């Protein structure tokens, strides 16, 4: 599709839902991550992610907003990928992620991240979409990423950063329930020779001098900075 000026209109972002499943481990809060298989067609090839996937026709009910459809997709995909049946009403919306349209991105996702308490059921991966899983303390997963042991996407890394501020499932769910989800409309920039992903409020987005809301993508040491 083209605009009246002859420019191509980027395709709309694909709605999707993913869920960070939480449990209290021996040393504190833990979250389930699953590893996507290597595939040239998979945007998240080889990365460790939360269970989830795109919204399909059966997830949509007349009158729903996007978050409700994404929630259904997250519940359905979790059951398909890791055999855990979550209750819809127990999921708490955390944030919504969407990259800014750029030509380099053939496909974009508008991804809702939800939080949910783990059930007592055993995790069983489907062996197709998912072949590995593990429970991680959020900060440990971030450290493994810094050391090059596991791959994470920026939204997953940022979510782990938020989870790492909490010591228990009760604590993080209470925090998430009493805040409004944020919309992270991601765009890339450069500062001091380093690539950064910037969001609402940052100097590179809104022009406010010295305002920071960004993720520095420095090899081996991603760093989140926010003062707005």
Locations of regions flagged by a protein language model:
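N-terminal leader/linker segments that precede catalytic domains of diphosphate-processing enzymes
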Residues: 1-130, 135-228
């Amino acid at each position: 599709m083209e605009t009246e000026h002859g420019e191509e209109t980027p395709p709309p972002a694909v709605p999707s839902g993913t869920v960070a499943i939480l449990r209290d481990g021996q040393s504190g809060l833990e979250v389930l991550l699953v590893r996507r298989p290597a595939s040239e067609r998979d945007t998240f090839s080889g990365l460790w992610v939360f269970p989830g996937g795109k919204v399909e026709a059966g997830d949509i009910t007349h009158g729903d907003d996007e978050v409700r459809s994404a929630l259904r997709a997250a519940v359905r995909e979790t059951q398909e990928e890791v055999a855990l049946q979550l209750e819809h009403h127990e999921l708490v919306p955390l944030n919504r992620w969407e990259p800014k349209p750029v030509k380099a991105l053939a496909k974009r996702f508008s991804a809702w991240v939800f939080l949910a308490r783990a059930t007592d059921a055993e995790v069983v991966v489907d062996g197709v979409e998912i072949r590995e899983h593990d429970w991680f303390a959020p900060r440990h997963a971030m450290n493994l990423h810094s050391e090059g042991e596991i791959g994470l996407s920026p939204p997953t890394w940022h979510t782990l950063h938020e989870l790492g501020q909490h010591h228990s499932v009760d604590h993080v769910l209470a925090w998430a329930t009493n805040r409004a989800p944020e919309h992270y409309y991601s765009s890339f920039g450069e500062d001091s020779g380093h690539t950064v992903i910037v969001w609402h409020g940052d100097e590179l987005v809104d022009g406010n001098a010295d305002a920071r809301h960004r993720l520095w993508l420095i090899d081996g040491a991603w760093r989140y900075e926010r003062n707005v």
